[in-house]
Design a protein with these regions (language model features):
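Cytosolic catalytic headpieces and adjacent flexible linkers of membrane translocases
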Residues: 1-4, 8-136, 154, 158-214
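Conserved Lys-Pro-Asp/Glu-containing loop-to-beta segment of HAD-superfamily phosphomonoesterases
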Residues: 133-150
């Protein structure tokens, strides 16, 4: 006999009103998460980031093909990864992009910019993809504030104009953030050394072990 258990992580009482105030004051609110698309869309609907029918832009089952599908898995349109995006869909739906689809579109800068400019939810994205989304938003002229509550958000927090870290204050989280910042500083120093050696026609210095093993 099969058994099921349902667990719900309730929203904070002021979450909906806070997001509503941001949306009503000419701010654009976007969700970027590692959760799956259906979970992300459900939460985004609760906080009114998604107001229309949601459409998921995802990688198909074969090769590099992409699909535009509803939450019930019905296909709205197929998308040739090398063809222009179906722009009319942005006018009809609130779009959720998966990390798998983002990996395909990353190779096409103009399509990526158009997609990021019209997407309200990102699901199943990696830490590097979170950082990429923030980078593209800034290139589109947005002043970006990123709020994140885990070490997976550190890169995106640093990429944003304003990064708000929502931590539980545990020593482990703080140590990870400090270590990430230290590695970033070492990386910049090493890149400066590479540039200097190249300018003087000298061989590159060895990669510091701490960077090589990172």
């Amino acid at each position: 006999r099969q058994r099921q258990m349902c667990i719900r992580d309730r929203l904070k009482p002021d979450a909906v009103e806070s997001l509503r105030q941001l949306n009503n004051s000419a701010h654009r609110c976007v969700m970027i998460t590692g959760d799956n698309a259906l979970t992300a869309i459900h939460i985004a609907e609760e906080v009114e980031i998604v107001a229309r029918e949601a459409l998921i832009f995802d990688k198909g089952a074969v090769g590099e093909e992409l699909v535009w599908r509803r939450t019930d898995d019905s296909i709205v349109r197929m998308q040739d990864p090398d063809a222009p995006l179906h722009r009319h869909l942005f006018d009809e739906y609130d779009v959720c992009v998966t990390g798998a689809a983002l990996r395909v579109i990353e190779e096409r800068p103009e399509a990526l910019r158009e997609l990021v400019g019209n997407t309200v939810v990102y699901a199943r994205v990696s830490p590097n993809q979170k950082e990429l989304v923030l980078s593209v938003l800034r290139s589109l002229g947005y002043i970006a504030l990123m709020a994140g509550d885990g070490t997976n958000d550190v890169g995106a927090l640093k990429m944003a104009n304003i990064g708000v870290a929502l931590l539980d204050g545990s020593e482990e989280d703080l140590q990870r953030i400090q270590e990430h910042a230290r590695l970033e500083r070492l990386k910049k120093v090493y890149e400066s050394q590479l540039s200097l050696m190249s300018r003087w026609g000298q061989p590159p210095p060895p990669v510091p072990p701490v960077l090589r093993d990172a």
